[in-house]
Swiss-Prot record:
Belongs to the V-ATPase H subunit family. It holds the Pfam family V-ATPase_H_C. This is Probable V-type proton ATPase subunit H 1. Keywords: Hydrogen ion transport, Ion transport, Transport. SUPFAM superfamilies: ARM repeat (SSF48371). The gene is vha-18. It comes from Caenorhabditis briggsae.
C-alpha cells in the first residue's frame, strides 16, 4: 500500500468553502490608508493577486522575498476581520499546494527572526471560525511535512492537541474530513505519530470513526488509514493494544462491503502484529484479534473473489498468525494458567466445543482442584467479567462431563449460581441463568444456548 492513496478524497465542505473565499473582492487600500498594514504589504499582495500563472506567482515571490512573508504575517495579524484572515490563509495554502518548496520562504524569515516558522500560524488555531482553524491545519501540515524544519516540542504538542480536538467534535463538525486529511499526511513522519499517540490519539480516532459511521465509507476509510499509519511505529502499535482499536475495526471488517475499507483494516491488523518487536505484545495483539472473531471473519472473506495482491497477502498472514494463537489458547495448559491466576476473560477455550469435549474431565483432577477454583470465584469475585466466564465454564463442565451436575452441587456451585441471579449486573445474571439451566435439564442442545 502506498502513501499516495490519501490524495483520492471526497470533495469536502472545506474545499467548497475555499472556492467561495477565493471569489472575495478585497479592498487592501482601505487598510493601507488606515495604516493597519504597510505600503510594502499592499504592494506585495496586490501584485501577487494579479499574477495569473504559477510562473508569474513564483516571479513575484522571488522579487519580494522576505517582504512576502512579512506581508502575509501582517495581513493575518493586523487585520482582525475573519473574512480577510480567511482570504489570506487561502492564498498561502494555495501557494504551498502549488509548490511545497515555497515553505522555505517562511523558514528563511523565521531563522532571521530567531523564531519557529510554525509560530506565524499556531496562534490562529484558537480562533472560533472553523474555516480559519482548518486552513491553518492545512498550511501547518504542508510546512511540517515538506519543509526542512520539523515542528517539535510544545509547538508539536499544541498542533496535535488541536487536531485531536477537531476530530472529537464529531459529525456536527463539517470540517472533520479536512482534519483527517491532514493527519493522513502528517503521520508519514514518525515523531508526529508518537506525539499524537501520547495524547490518547487512538481514542479520538475511534470516536471519529463512530461519530461519522453514517457519513459513507470514504471518511471511514480515511480514519482507518490514519490508524494504519500510526501502527508503523512500534510504540504506537503497543499502545493500540491498551484500548479498543482492534474491537472497533474488527466490527467494521465484519460489516463493510467496500474492498478498500477491508484492505486498510487488514493492513492495520497486520501492522499491529508485525510492528510490535516484543514477542509478548505480538501474542497479545493476536489474542485480541482471536477474541474479536477476526479469524472467523477472515474465513468468511475467503468466499469473496479479491484481486488486490496486498489484501490477499494480509489475509494469509493474519490467518497463519491467528491459527498459531488458537492452538495455544485452546490448550488446557493455557486455560489452567488463566484459571490459577484468577484472570478469566473470553479467551477461545471458554466457548470452544472441542476444548470442553476433550478437557472437561480434567477439572476433576487432583481432588477437583480446578473445579473448586471456579466455584470459589463464583462465591468471592467482585469482577463481573470473571463471574460471567466462571458461570459459563461451570455450565460447560456440567454439559460435557457425565457426572458434572453431581460434583457441582456437592461443592456448593448450584447455590453460588442462584445467588448470582439477583446481582445488579445483567450480564452476570444472564450467564448464571444459563449455567443454572444446564444443571436442571438433561438435553443441553434443546436449550439452543449457543452464545
Amino acid at each position: 500500500m502506498v502513501f499516495g492513496e490519501n490524495q483520492d478524497l471526497i470533495r469536502t465542505h472545506f474545499q467548497k468553502e475555499a472556492d467561495k473565499v477565493r471569489q472575495m473582492k478585497t479592498n487592501w487600500g482601505l487598510f493601507t490608508r488606515s495604516r493597519m498594514i504597510a505600503q510594502s504589504d499592499y504592494d506585495f499582495v496586490v501584485t501577487y493577486e494579479q499574477a495569473e500563472t504559477e510562473q508569474d506567482r513564483s516571479t513575484v515571490l522571488s522579487v519580494f522575498k522576505e517582504k512576502a512573508v512579512y506581508a502575509f504575517v501582517h495581513l493575518m495579524s493586523q487585520i482582525s476581520k475573519d473574512d480577510y484572515v480567511r482570504y489570506t490563509l487561502t492564498i498561502i495554502d494555495d501557494m504551498l499546494r502549488e509548490d511545497v518548496s515555497r515553505t522555505k520562504i517562511f523558514e528563511e524569515v523565521a531563522v532571521l527572526l530567531k523564531r519557529s516558522p510554525f509560530s506565524f500560524f499556531l496562534g490562529l488555531l484558537h480562533r472560533q471560525d472553523q474555516y480559519i482553524v482548518h486552513t491553518t491545519f492545512s498550511v501547518l501540515t504542508k510546512m511540517a511535512v515538506f519543509g526542512n524544519i520539523k515542528v517539535t516540542g510544545d509547538e508539536l504538542d499544541y498542533f496535535m492537541g488541536s487536531l485531536k480536538e477537531a476530530i472529537t467534535r464529531g459529525i456536527a463538525n463539517d470540517y472533520i474530513a479536512t482534519a483527517v486529511r491532514c493527519m493522513q499526511t502528517l503521520f508519514r513522519i514518525d515523531p508526529y505519530r508518537v506525539s499524537f499517540v501520547n495524547i490518547s490519539g487512538y481514542e479520538s480516532l475511534s470516536h471519529a470513526l463512530y461519530s461519522t459511521r453514517k457519513c459513507g465509507f470514504q471518511i471511514q476509510y480515511q480514519i482507518i488509514f490514519c490508524m494504519w499509519l500510526l501502527t508503523f511505529n512500534g510504540h504506537a502499535a503497543e499502545v493500540a493494544l491498551c484500548g479498543n482499536l482492534i474491537q472497533t475495526i474488527s466490527t467494521i471488517l465484519g460489516t463493510s462491503h467496500k474492498e478498500k475499507v477491508i484492505r486498510i483494516v487488514l493492513a492495520t491488523l497486520r501492522n499491529l502484529i508485525a510492528s510490535n518487536e516484543d514477542e509478548y505484545m505480538k501474542k497479545q495483539a493476536a489474542r485480541q484479534m482471536v477474541q474479536n472473531q477476526i479469524l472467523v471473519k477472515l474465513d468468511h472473506l475467503e468466499n469473496r473473489k479479491f484481486q488486490d495482491v496486498d489484501l490477499i497477502d494480509d489475509m494469509a498472514f493474519l490467518q497463519k498468525e491467528l491459527k498459531k494463537v488458537v492452538e495455544v489458547l485452546t490448550s488446557f495448559e493455557e486455560y489452567e494458567s488463566e484459571l490459577r491466576h484468577g484472570a478469566l476473560f473470553w479467551s477461545p477455550p471458554h466457548k470452544c466445543e472441542i476444548f470442553w469435549t476433550e478437557n472437561a474431565h480434567k477439572l476433576n483432577d487432583n481432588r477437583q482442584e480446578l473445579l473448586k477454583m471456579l466455584i470459589t470465584m463464583l462465591e468471592k469475585s467482585n469482577d463481573p467479567l470473571v463471574l460471567c466466564v466462571a458461570a459459563n465454564d461451570i455450565g460447560e463442565f456440567v454439559r460435557y462431563y457425565p457426572r458434572g451436575k453431581m460434583h457441582v452441587e456437592q461443592l456448593g456451585g448450584k447455590e453460588a449460581l442462584m445467588r448470582l441471579l439477583t446481582v445488579p449486573d445483567p450480564n452476570v445474571r444472564y450467564f448464571a441463568l444459563l449455567a443454572a439451566q444446564k444443571l436442571m435439564v438433561n438435553h443441553w442442545k434443546d436449550l439452543g444456548l449457543e452464545i
